[in-house]
């Protein structure tokens, strides 16, 4: 290695410098040999600071870059980048490569000129001297090329300092870097010249604000994001990215002169990658030519590797690996593509620093376009030998790490399956979650059907090899036409196919971390469909994650048709890190009945797919994987539900040897999935057709029936001090209590010195601006970014969705796009809401007509006209609907009305009092964007959940304090009016009532789509409660005047009470004691009642001194029943087992719903539109939370981090009941649903 300190070359004048460049190589590059720079040369100077980006430098000439030839402006940054477009303000570049924009990076690092000692200069220069100087540098690097530039961009970083960060050391102080980048362009090509003078690089790493650690600089080029509908990284090239290679920049060269590096960056030859110069650094004075031995010495000395693909007649240079037989990498997630085979030329040869010097980065020449085209990905061993000593964390917690001669490998322990990096319990059901987006042309249509952010959920019964996949919110225009594409979910079946002896399914091979690209050709139909799927392993919830993209054209299948696919087999061909398969299959389309006949047609389509993954090649002793395996799909079921817009695929899969026909009936049942083991058990094959069933880890039983082991109950102290144990199916989870965090030893320690950081609160996150995205705090120091409704992206970069491009409005309406929203307005001469427009003037509503009739104004009511004394005039809202509360201004009486203006019985109140009326008309949503209804998962801890029209928001609690700055939306369904809320602490699911549809729905706190469980035979469902022990829900219906019960999935409904009720609203349960409580705010006879949960022993608890009792809550710890009254403006409590009531607080404004937690009551108030905390012990309001959007608040409940202790007679085995098990004090009652037709149901006590 040359020593820079040993350079003793004399200084030369500029003229002699040019002569030396032409005659032969020089020594180390002196600063005087840089291109002239500074204000005297006409340079612009970048503003001093950190992370500064220059204004656009408009170019006179055009710059070529990769396959682009239209770049007319560039941007210069403090951090050693020349950008082809303006860098996003939210993107942090140092320590990450490639960035999202086109970039030339002579020294990408976190650089700082805040102190004013360093400077960044830049200009475009057309002077003959500079143009000739650039031409000579290029000529040195590419002697076979005749290049005469017409424009030169010169950028100089002079004496720039590193951003030190909090970990800066005194040894780094005073160190400065000077380097230069020159972009020379002609009409046909562009070149980059990087110049690193002697002693110009004094530091090689900088502090990363993102990773909070020292990271090496990067030298490279990036095309940036490419693609129209779906963005992905384009081609990029890295030439240095560790300390040793960065140090070599001033000592080495690819253009024959130390410190000089030349690259061809824009020409027909660079469409797939930047081309490095290939001129040896001459180490001898006589300038003699060298043989290959010397070439090997020099390139090895410089840290360069020839990665060009040799032709059969051209062997790789000695000392370098054949690119078609490269070692495999162990570090996950980094890929390099095979270069296209063909005869190499000097123009296509690429150089890169040796792979073993880059343990944390991608191999250097990456061609994403070729990955997408061929799907072939090879893994490179990018690091020196790695051992388990410092890489154990790369293995699953259920795996062991083993060292081998060339590296380490992970292997799952007994009773677990996977590839070692990812392991799951054998026989345990698996869940797969992900997103799907598509751009699909149906039939001959020229307009694509576009959908984004669509949920995919899959459930896998592993020991039977059955996979059930559902894709939600698929438009009907494309839903039926996607029915033949069962392999969208079939890849999940391959992952968990039943394994025959000696054969491996996809998860055993890949661990659920791979990329799949498939191409579907429909014979006899033009066009094709491309399917891309990325599996990203197991997330923190134990679920596999997948992203799916669909693009292309499919044949049209008639609405209402069904598709039948016969069982089939598919051969999978295996080689290192690559799996391929192709097949030709049939599917039959059966059209809907027409005149008693159902026409059917059989079609043929071809599938070709490539799966790329990373494997561990260090374990030579492991059994070799068969080169070909056969996937047998024994049953295929496909369905499109147009009402729910859900696409479903179900397949049964096994993997084994190549054979003809269906699986042998004499095979072991474990291999073909015909055993009778529990879904939480593993099937163990024995001799012949014998087998045994063994419950999976975390379950107990005989294998035929397995029960979850409650590890938390069996060993309550297993999580240690300051921790809470949460039981989960098959496992458990320990969570540190507030104020503690896990130490390296897995115990909870006080977080005094390492408090978690809420980056959302501090603003130190990388989410897009608040106008486009929200930062969602997930607990600890973690957060996630989510684009706001009306924007799309990953949350870090969100772009406005132009809804008007998708023809959202009626053809006779104007569409106005706005950031995050859009508006539809009927054209003149048409009436409607913009989504439906009809000729004519806008018709008046019933309320408007009645109001005008009473006022005697046929042409419209005069707002200034006085109302006749004693006359009732209805009040209409801004949309023409009846205001839910109507009042007679002469008498002072008020009452509730339905949507048709009819008075609701029992709602009339005397002067000075207004009844708590609910609007059954959902607010219009056409003024905003289509809001996705996906649930935003809740972080750990206890939360208040409250409803605000169609939105449910969460408000974290720390002990009894509301953490108001962390309030976020949990769920938003714009078309609904959510009234009541209840929380199931067992499954972590929130239930609600909706009076606009009307319906009852639910959603999991872990995320996913909300579902409706009841939508039939409802009037105005309001209050809702549940029995988390007996697994039932209860609700009140103020229109049908009844109280009902059902199972938690909405089945087995039974009416408990339908008499003696006028306006039932609040309802709560005491599952441990078997009691039910509810309010009835009938103005003539308001009351609070109770009964056993089976409907027996009904009685009145409170009747006197009540006004409008709304909300109701029961505290299981203190056995107190509390309520809020909007008529008396009080909060009161009582113990149902004891006489007497206690006034907690008077002077409440207009309380609606209430819940309790610890010593506090929390209630929603209609007048202040707020959530108020009230201390029961001192009878005082302690805090108030005002949501960002000031609209009416409805139900409120508490989402507990764990269930309260207790049980009832329905807790175990449904109390021995065949259907509804309803607890009573000290017992239970078995009840049948109201509709028992054809149901074998037994009622008993």
From Swiss-Prot:
Disulfides per UniProt: 388-401, 395-410, 409-616, 412-423, 670-683, 677-693, 695-706, 712-725, 719-734, 736-748, 760-775, 767-785, 787-798, 804-815, 809-824, 826-837, 847-876, 887-894, 896-917, 1210-1221, 1217-1230, 1232-1241
PTM sites of type Sulfotyrosine: 290, 295
GO MF terms, alphabetically ordered: calcium ion binding; collagen binding; extracellular matrix binding; laminin-1 binding; proteoglycan binding
InterPro entries in UniProt: 6-blade_b-propeller_TolB-like (IPR011042), cEGF (IPR026823), Cueball_EGF_LRP_Nidogen (IPR050778), EGF-like_Ca-bd_dom (IPR001881), EGF-like_dom (IPR000742), EGF-type_Asp/Asn_hydroxyl_site (IPR000152), EGF_Ca-bd_CS (IPR018097), EGF_dom (IPR024731)
Alphabetical list of Gene3D superfamilies matching this protein: Green fluorescent protein, Laminin, Thyroglobulin type-1, TolB, C-terminal domain
Subcellular location: Secreted, Extracellular space, Extracellular matrix, Basement membrane
Signal peptide: 1-28
Domain EGF-like: 384-424, 666-707, 708-749, 756-799, 800-838, 1206-1242
Domain named NIDO: residues: 106-268
Keyword Membrane: no
Motif (Cell attachment site): 700-702
SMART domains xref list: EGF, EGF_CA, G2F, LY, NIDO, TY
One of the record's GO cellular component terms: collagen-containing extracellular matrix
Domain Thyroglobulin type-1 residue range list: 844-917
Keyword Calcium included in the entry's annotation: yes
GO terms (BP aspect): cell-matrix adhesion; extracellular matrix organization; glomerular basement membrane development; positive regulation of cell adhesion; positive regulation of cell-substrate adhesion; positive regulation of integrin-mediated signaling pathway; positive regulation of muscle cell differentiation; regulation of basement membrane organization
Site (Involved in perlecan binding): 457, 459, 648
Domain spans labelled Nidogen G2 beta-barrel: 428-665
Key words of the record: Basement membrane, Calcium, Cell adhesion, Disulfide bond, EGF-like domain, Extracellular matrix, Glycoprotein, Repeat, Secreted, Signal, Sulfation
Role played: Sulfated glycoprotein widely distributed in basement membranes and tightly associated with laminin. Also binds to collagen IV and perlecan. It probably has a role in cell-extracellular matrix interactions.
Assembly and binders: Interacts with FBLN1. Interacts with LGALS3BP. Interacts with PLXDC1. Interacts with SVEP1.
Protein name: Nidogen-1
Organism: Mus musculus
Gene: Nid1
